[in-house]
Amino acid sequence: MMKMMIMSSSNLMNINFMKMNHPMSIMMTIIIQTLFISMMTGTMMESFWLSYILLLTFLGGMMVLFIYITSIASNEMFKIKINSIIIIVYMMIILSTLMYKLDKTISTEMIKNSEIMNLNYSINFKEMSTSLVKLYNNPTVIITIMMMIYLFITLLAVVKITNINQGPMRKMS
């Protein structure tokens, strides 16, 4: 149920992304999409560590882009249309009810989840610690190293862009 709600919300954000025309609204849509993707990857894996690292990496890059766009974009007023928010909320409600009515396995999935929650206290902590080892094993260590390289290159780009001696990035006119 949770995965379907996240996927339907992500699809609605994709549709909403096409209607955006202001850079700040596009940035907010991308940040919300990043949150949805990290929640989806977290529900697919045993541990949320990889999704947490991905979220921090993407949000770090988005902060750099946010600073760049706010310094270059003109001082236009950012208006949020109430009608579009109401339409999105109604679409989410309609999609979630349709998914609930069409998928017959949701009720059994909710029962299984409640049974799993009752058994959750009997999990061995040694088994939980072995799931973190998978993050640094051979196939996934490449992803971790690529994230480190990405963060380092982003750090170098920010240091290169923001030179204190040259003043602000945008000239005041």
UniProtKB/Swiss-Prot annotation:
Protein keywords: Electron transport, Membrane, Mitochondrion, NAD, Respiratory chain, Translocase, Transmembrane, Transmembrane helix, Transport, Ubiquinone
EC number, UniProt record: 7.1.1.2
Transmembrane domains' residue ranges: 24-44, 49-69, 80-100, 139-159
Enzyme class: translocase
Intracellular or extracellular location(s): Mitochondrion membrane
Catalytic reaction(s) noted: a ubiquinone + NADH + 5 H(+)(in) = a ubiquinol + NAD(+) + 4 H(+)(out)
Entry GO MF terms: NADH dehydrogenase (ubiquinone) activity
Keyword NAD: yes
Statement: the UniProt record of this protein carries the keyword NAD: yes
Entry GO terms, CC: mitochondrial membrane
Record's bilayer topology term: Multi-pass membrane protein
Matches recorded under InterPro entries: ComplexI_Subunit6
Family statement: Belongs to the complex I subunit 6 family.
Function, in words: Core subunit of the mitochondrial membrane respiratory chain NADH dehydrogenase (Complex I) that is believed to belong to the minimal assembly required for catalysis. Complex I functions in the transfer of electrons from NADH to the respiratory chain. The immediate electron acceptor for the enzyme is believed to be ubiquinone.
This protein's name: NADH-ubiquinone oxidoreductase chain 6
Organism, as annotated: Locusta migratoria (Migratory locust)
Lineage: Eukaryota, Metazoa, Ecdysozoa, Arthropoda, Hexapoda
GN (gene name): ND6
